[in-house]
């Protein structure tokens, strides 16, 4: 809006409008209440300026229509002029004066706020403006926080019946569980009481039997002591006839076994003597030294077998297989070679007792496991 375009050719003299005094640039001017009042006045002035702009635009439209009210469009502005019986020039003059006065008032109201954007203004003004801005933002935040708080409180109040219902349901469930537990505990207590009563009755019923059992045990102990005493004195008890007959039967069987073993040893001696004769006739002349050694060994063995004082009487009690294996190799060279060949089937080529397909184990992990190993030297068994 530029009121200079609406200036009349000869404007009349008019007094300058009354302007508010210039408030102090710092201090009380930048408090919240004063700034709020100033902003309200500024908002009212801006609203008046917008209305004045619309009025001037309407007057310009009427003036462009050659200033004739009759030729102008019949609108609210023309009707107003006809009702007031005012000329278009006079109304234009009054409107321009009001617009100029309004612009002066607007400049006066905006003048205190010029220090905020002016770079040459002192820092006190800027700091006061910044503090006021912070206060206003804080006030806005507080309003928003209070609004959120009220909304949360309303939501909590709306949810309060639901919480009460939930608490009631939980209390009912807990009460039912506790009642079920109490009933189960009462049943368990009743069962325990019944079991105690049954145990007491059973104990009362078994007490005489237990007493009789203890008496029987004591009588048996006393009887065993008397039997031992009689045995020491040389008495024979009739209830031990089976044991006596069994001991007699075992002694007879032992004598029969000893007689049979003597017969077996005699037959073995005859068999060994016949084998010696056959091996002596079939041996080569190149093995004379070996035959002599075997004959000497056989003679020494025969002497030891015939000598009763050297403790060789147990040889006659050995079975045929044992005698043929252990003592036949000392007498018969053929039997010795046969035994050696039987053992060769279980020995490896290197003379070790470990089979050839045996996997060599890994070394021990530490000294403790190594101490468990037994280092036995290899023996030549061939």
UniProtKB/Swiss-Prot annotation:
Which keywords appear in this protein's UniProt record, sorted alphabetically?
Coiled coil, mRNA processing, mRNA splicing, Nucleus, Ribonucleoprotein, Spliceosome
Ranges in coiled-coil conformation: 31-63
Q: Where is this region: Disordered?
A: 274-297
Q: Where in the cell is it found?
A: Nucleus
Any one of the GO CC terms: spliceosomal complex
* Top-level taxonomic group: Eukaryota
- Subunit field text: Component of the U11/U12 snRNPs that are part of the U12-type spliceosome.
- Could you identify this protein by its name? U11/U12 small nuclear ribonucleoprotein 59 kDa protein
Q: Which species expresses this protein natively? A: Arabidopsis thaliana (Mouse-ear cress)
Organism classification: Eukaryota, Viridiplantae, Streptophyta, Embryophyta, Tracheophyta
């Amino acid at each position: 809006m530029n009121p200079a375009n609406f200036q009349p050719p000869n404007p009349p003299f008019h007094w300058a409008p009354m302007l508010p005094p210039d408030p102090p640039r710092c201090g009380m001017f930048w408090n919240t209440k004063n700034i709020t009042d100033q902003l309200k006045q500024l908002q009212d002035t801006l609203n008046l300026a917008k209305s004045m702009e619309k009025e001037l635009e309407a007057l310009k439209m009427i003036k462009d229509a050659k200033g004739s009210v009759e030729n102008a469009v019949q609108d609210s502005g023309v009707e107003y002029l006809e009702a007031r019986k005012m000329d278009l020039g006079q109304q234009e003059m009054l409107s321009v004066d009001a617009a100029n006065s309004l612009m002066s008032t607007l400049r006066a109201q905006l003048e205190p706020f010029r220090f905020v954007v002016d770079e040459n203004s002192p820092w006190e003004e800027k700091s006061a403006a910044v503090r006021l801005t912070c206060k206003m933002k804080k006030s806005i935040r507080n309003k928003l926080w209070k609004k959120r708080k009220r909304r949360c409180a309303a939501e909590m109040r709306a949810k309060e019946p639901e919480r009460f219902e939930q608490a009631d349901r939980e209390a009912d469930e807990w009460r039912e569980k506790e009642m079920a537990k109490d009933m189960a505990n009462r049943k368990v207590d009743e069962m325990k009481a019944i079991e105690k009563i049954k145990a007491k009755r059973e104990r009362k019923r078994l007490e005489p039997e237990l007493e009789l059992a203890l008496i029987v045990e004591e009588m048996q102990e006393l009887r065993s002591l008397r039997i031992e005493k009689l045995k020491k004195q040389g008495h024979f008890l009739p209830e031990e006839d089976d044991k006596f007959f069994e001991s007699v039967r075992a002694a007879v069987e032992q004598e029969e076994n000893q007689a049979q073993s003597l017969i077996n040893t005699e037959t073995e001696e005859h068999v060994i003597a016949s084998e010696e004769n056959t091996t002596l006739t079939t041996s080569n002349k190149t093995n004379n030294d070996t035959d002599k050694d075997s004959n000497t060994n056989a003679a020494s063995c025969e002497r030891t077998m015939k000598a009763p004082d050297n403790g060789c009487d147990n040889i006659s009690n050995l079975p045929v297989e044992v005698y043929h294996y252990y003592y036949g190799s000392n007498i018969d060279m053929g039997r010795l070679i046969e035994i050696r060949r039987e053992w060769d089937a279980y020995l490896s080529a290197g003379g070790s007792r470990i089979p050839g397909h045996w996997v060599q184990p890994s070394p021990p992990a530490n000294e403790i496991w190594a101490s468990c190993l037994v280092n036995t030297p290899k023996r030549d068994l061939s």
